[in-house]
Structures are given as C-alpha cells and as structure tokens.
C-alpha cells in the first residue's frame, strides 16, 4: 500500500434540524465546486431515525485548493488547524445545504410547499481531511488486482478498482480468478 499514490478528499458530516424532503438517499453532485457526493447516513438500516445525519465528499479540485491554503503550518491541535478546519466545514456545509434545498424545491408539489416547513438548517457539522481517500491509479485505469513482487500474494480492495464496495468485490473476484488460473496451470504440469 505504501507504493499506492492517492489523492486527498475532505469528508463532511452534518446533522440537520429535520428530515430533508429529497427523492434520494445518496447522490453524485454535478456542477458544485465543493461537493462531488452526498449520502443520508440516517437512511441506513438499523440507524436511529430521529437524528438526520448526512455525509459529503469534496471534489478533488476543492480539496486541493483548500489543502494548499492550509499549507504545513496547520498541525492538528493548533489554532491555525482549527481555523482552517472551521472554514472548510462552513463552506462545505453551505454547499450541502444548497444541494439539499434545491432537491427539496424540485421535489415539492403544489400541495406540499417547503414554505410550510421549518427552514432546513445544520445543527452540527465537522469536516475531516481524508489524506489517502482515493488512489490516483483508479483514475488511470488500474488493474483490478495488484500482484505483489514479494511473493505469491495479491493485494485487493477498492483502491485497486473503484472507490466503493463494488470495486472491492470486483478486485477480490479478479484475484480469485488469477489464483484459480495459476493453480490450474500448475496442476497440468
């Protein structure tokens, strides 16, 4: 894993004052400078429904610009780091609210206006730097598995194929196929 180049992302977690009336529980976000993906954590099975938690990931470009502004003088625990993190949290939170409010407006019918509800607001938010979020090799069309030169070992996971559960499964299946083929080839000797 040390040889895998990755790109950072900022991850955001918020709680809302009420349920967002949007027709999705997760979405890729297009046309937003700050966000690329959002999901309703509260919609997962077994989650407490009285708290509305959403998570979001920043775009690569936004993360790069924010992290370059942070420079190296913002070590965790310092006032400079907390100021930088508060600014990133605020900007990403506003972008998330914009997306959710637009979703509510688009989802509203004539009889159910969003004007009748409390305005959608964030009650808690926190951003986090996810330093090695997504491998750059995925963007370059990486193999779905990686053979490690140290021996008969395959490294698998979402970092090899796609940054999600489907990528992890695809990667594991590709390694299993390669191992089965190697065993079959040895058996024929």
For each of these PLM feature ranges, what is it?
Residues 1-33:
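Central helical "cap/lid" subdomain
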Residues 18-24, 44-49, 62-65:
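Short helix-loop capping/hinge motifs at secondary-structure junctions, enriched
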Residues 10-15, 46-49, 188:
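Low-complexity, flexible helical/coil segments
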Residues 10-12, 34-36, 52-54, 151-152:
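A generic secondary-structure signal marking the coil-to-beta-strand transition
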